[in-house]
């Protein structure tokens, strides 16, 4: 949600700021702006509603010169998406960009109005600008003023601030919303996501919770919550990402669907050996500690939560470990029993999801045995704060609707199931079966992608529909949930998912000739039960679309279309059956003409509550 870019350099940095914002477009936004200070201490500010390109066009019309600047893409929380609410916000010579929410902004606003400040916008961000301005007038440096302001702010935020009277310095403050410093040669940068800075540097410092950083062209000074100078680790990034390169694909989502075989291969690389899963990357003490796990608690949001629901079936059936899955925003506010023998697993593509981070921190207070994160971004907050981390190696995922991050999360979770099962004394033959299935997975998905044209034609049936129902059983039920989420995210069709056995308990009332029902039907022990559910829908005139194993015994009939899929190993069937539902959602969205990569009202990384 939202994006921040900042730069301090000897060269003009407007183009760097604009390019950084372009690389953050995938996070979702409704307006964009920048402020640049030149060597004569003149500040130039420009804000536009709409795409970053609108801002770029305005910059082209009136060249913006200067080597110190900040820029922002805004996703509205306080105040409508219009120019006056777009960032940066200013108070005389102070300019601020900010991600997150200041929970006590109304109280601060009243205090500032009493001091004579006038508010132009409806945002919570403007209080930061005025507070810093007020503290500056009381004396001290910009850094000292900000250090006095921060304790007065309640909420989760990341803010970058500059003073036009002091070109060559920008200050960053992190409290719950990610910020990263990019290290250059005679120039330094700031952003909310390292992707924004890849054209100018590969060296990064990730700010930790409560950090305040003073960044100049040649120096970076970081202070912790006690105001003491601290050193933070420098990380060399190997992420490959070209924001403008969709290659032969129309959208990032389409590209990322097709990248899944390679993403899974990368995720499996060096982790499968001689019929075993090799997770030695967890360190020498991991096996001894994880062998003590008596219960697993998974917390996640959105698509990652659906991955957690699939893995619950695996952890219990294959590793024999009791497992619960909970939405992170519910877990963090529920009064939980203490869990001394419990492993907390967090799932997040970005590693910065606010509710998931809060759940991790809560688990430490509750006495959990240990924590492990499955994440796609090295150096992210979840990776740094968890005891153990297993990285998905999906590469940058730009489309808001997650595809390859989901399937690589499931891939890692299945490896973890095999590893924990071995620690618990599960038969070695089962681990060998998991390893065999995982080896086969990339080629199985490549075969699935060859069905794309069939699904493209099928999608035409959905162009005039307003609702859809997804059904599955067992570990395919969460896949039905994920399919419904994808369809509603990018095509704006209202879609719900149920365990097929729940039809009689309510959803059957929705079935009529205008309600498409999408069913995932692998050839497993639940197939006959699922066929009974299918007949219940047929008897009531429902429109059935069944993604079925080619050996499951289905044939097309009136009111029922069968999409036959190649047989796949049962262990990896949930991952495999995800792909046709991704393709269906993508093609329906194309037909409806929605913004596939940046669907309305949604953001890629939700870093606030």
UniProtKB/Swiss-Prot annotation:
Protein name in UniProt: Glutamine--fructose-6-phosphate aminotransferase [isomerizing]
GO cellular component: cytosol
HAMAP family: GlmS
Domain Glutamine amidotransferase type-2: 2-218
Record EC number: 2.6.1.16
Active-site residue numbers: 2 (nucleophile), 604 (for fru-6p isomerization activity)
Pfam families xref list: GATase_6, SIS
Name of the coding gene: glmS
InterPro entries documented for this protein: GATase_2_dom, GFAT, GFAT_N, GlmS/AgaS_SIS, GlmS/FrlB_SIS, Ntn_hydrolases_N, SIS_dom, SIS_dom_sf
GO MF entry, a single one: glutamine-fructose-6-phosphate transaminase (isomerizing) activity
Keyword Transferase: yes
Subcellular location: Cytoplasm
Record note on quaternary structure: Homodimer.
CDD domains the UniProt entry points to: GFAT, SIS_GlmS_GlmD_1, SIS_GlmS_GlmD_2
Keywords linked to the UniProt accession: Aminotransferase, Cytoplasm, Glutamine amidotransferase, Repeat, Transferase
Function: Catalyzes the first step in hexosamine metabolism, converting fructose-6P into glucosamine-6P using glutamine as a nitrogen source.
Catalysis: reaction(s): D-fructose 6-phosphate + L-glutamine = D-glucosamine 6-phosphate + L-glutamate
Organism: Photorhabdus laumondii subsp. laumondii (strain DSM 15139 / CIP 105565 / TT01) (Photorhabdus luminescens subsp. laumondii)
Residues annotated as domain SIS: 286-426, 458-599
Signal sequence segment: none
GO biological process, one term: UDP-N-acetylglucosamine metabolic process
